[in-house]
Structures are given as C-alpha cells and as structure tokens.
Amino acid sequence: MSAPLKNSDPVTVDVALGDRSYDIVIGRGILPSLGERIAALRPGARVAIVTDEYVATHWLRATEASLLGAGIATSRIVVDEGEVSKSYEGIEFVCEELIKARIERNDLVVALGGGVVGDLAGFAAAIVRRGVDFVQVPTSLLAQVDSSVGGKTGINSPQGKNLVGAFHQPILVVADTAVLDTLSPRQFRAGYAEVAKYGLLGDEAFFAWLETNHADIVKGSAARESAVAASCRAKAAIVARDERETGERALLNLGHTFGHALETATGFSDRLYHGEGVSIGMVLAAELSAQLGMIADADVARIRRHLATAGLPTRLQDIAGFRQEGLADADGLMALMAQDKKVKRGRLTFILLQAIGQAVVSSDVEPSTVRDFLARKLADAPA
C-alpha cells in the first residue's frame, strides 16, 4: 500500500496547439482530482485504464476510485512491465482489449504508467476506431518530463526504437509528483537524464540550477515540482512551434541517436534503461561536438561530471555486459543508427552542442567520422 498523498497547489502548463491545446497539471497529491478533471472534459465518457503490473500494484486502486467517485465507468487493461510490452504483440493485445471493452470514439483511454505505458496506450488510442482521445497520467520521472508531453506514441521494432507509431496528442496530462516516491532509485535516475537534457539543449541557467538543486529534486521537495514544471514548459514551447518534428523539435532528441542504438543493441532489456542510454548518448554527442571543434572541453567535462554525480552512466563501459555481440562493434552501432527516425536521404542526423544550453541539428557529420569516433570510444573501454 502506497503512502497517503499530500496535496500541493498544482501548476498548469499549456501546450498551445490551437483547438487541440491541452493542459499539463503538475503537483503533489493531485491524483485524486483525476476523475473530476476528466468528467469536466468529457461528460459521460467511459474510461479504459491501461497500466502495467508494477504501477497497478501502487496506483490503480486510487485511480479507479477517483474515476468512480466522479461517476465514470471504468475498465482496466494490465500489461507486463517494461519494454517487452512495447511491441507488436503488446499493441495487438491492448487494441483487442479496448475493442472487447467496447471503447468508442467518444470514450477515453487513460495511460497510467511510465514511458512504455504512455507510448503503448497512446498508440492504441490513435488507431482503435481510427482515433480515441486519451489522457496521460505519467508515473515515472521520465514520463512526467518528456514522453507524456507532445503526442509521440508508438512501439519498438526488432530493427530499432520507436519505429512504428503515430502523433496523437493527449487531451490532458496529470503529473502527480508524489507517485515518483514509489520509483526505484535507478528508475528515478534514468528519468533525471531527460531533465538534464532541457538544460543542455537550450537553457544553461536551468542546467546550473540542476547542479545546485539535484539533491533536493531526489528528496522530493518543492524543487522536484519545479524541475518537472520547467521541463514541461521547455518541451511544450518547442512542441507548440514544431509539433511534427520538421525542425526545432528534433533538438529534443539530444543524446537519442546514440542512445536508441545502444538500447537496441542491448535488446531493450534491463541492461540499459532509456534514460541511461540518453545519458551516455548526451555525453557521446558532447564529446563528438568537441572533436568537431564546436564545444569547449571544459563544458564536456561539466556535463559528464553532473550526470555522473546524479548516478547516471556516462561511458560505454558503464553498460552491463557491453562486450556482448552487437554492442562492442562500431559498424554494428552505425547500422543501428542508420534506422534512426531522423535519418534523411540516408544521412544520419545528430543533435550537437556548441555550448551548454546551445544545441544544433546537424546532418553534416561524415559517417566515417562517427564510425572512427565510436571505434575509439569502444577501444577506450576496458575488457
């Protein structure tokens, strides 16, 4: 049984997308308000809650109680925990369960969980009956600051991360920071990588604030809500300007070109969480930027130092069993990166750094340069 939630005044961040705009509501102890918020948005709608086994143990009962208290009929769909559910088999299961539950276009799907559940439930909502609205109730730090915002949904392919999906914006995001108390330390750290990302890509002052306040964010003080809100504001602003990732939104993929390849190489397993891959990927992107003469070595050292202080991996050798087949091979990693969603006309696209808080999108890095860079990084790692 989870500890009782203690309320705080919520912060609301608007994702401005015209008639598809929606609110991100952030606060401690706000999960019980979910039912009344949904009832106000969709009177009479039924709700199918999609969650995973771990989250169901902690938060499904409270979520159902909130919905039922607002007079909302509910059903539940529980999937396996982890990336294993973000698959063709996983999306088939959720879609069939939604159809069996007779969820109609005027009903709602509620994604109660971390990034995997949000991506999976959102994709199912996008394609069942050619589109059902959905609400994100993110329960991991990573989901609260990143994956629940912006409408990217989808599943993995054996060929790579997030290669099958759709843009489908939620109608509401309710981020209760109290639920983060049930995360394991490793899960929390993995989510923190995405928080640090916002400072690196466009806000040096925020990165400096994180360096000072990281310990308080971990403790769950008001600094945690501030970090979540600042991250959501940063992402919401970019999404409002570039919803479909035709330009600026690509900056949000800082660290992801390398990181997704590493996740694929490790079989989407517990060897490497998504945020851990992003952490290593951001350091690699910074180091590649330095090699290209774009960023000062002192900035790279500062990035590496803060991520390491936060308990995140920063080197390839930090990955468990990194010498296994498919990881410790530069050509293999290059092949995986060639499947990245940002590839255009066969050329890799990287998010590189000119300084902390100054990121740029580049398709000008020669593949041979990247391959040699990776080969050196792999050779640096002890056997």
UniProtKB/Swiss-Prot annotation:
Pfam families (alphabetical): DHQ_synthase, DHQS_C
Chief subcellular location: cytoplasm
Gene3D superfamilies from the UniProt entry: 3.40.50.1970, Dehydroquinate synthase-like - alpha domain (1.20.1090.10)
MF GO annotations: 3-dehydroquinate synthase activity; metal ion binding; nucleotide binding
Intracellular or extracellular location(s): Cytoplasm
Cofactor(s) the protein requires to work: Co(2+); Zn(2+); NAD(+)
Any one biological process term the GO annotation gives: chorismate biosynthetic process
Purpose: Catalyzes the conversion of 3-deoxy-D-arabino-heptulosonate 7-phosphate (DAHP) to dehydroquinate (DHQ).
Name by which UniProt lists this protein: 3-dehydroquinate synthase
Originating organism: Nitrobacter hamburgensis (strain DSM 10229 / NCIMB 13809 / X14)
Gene that encodes the chain: aroB
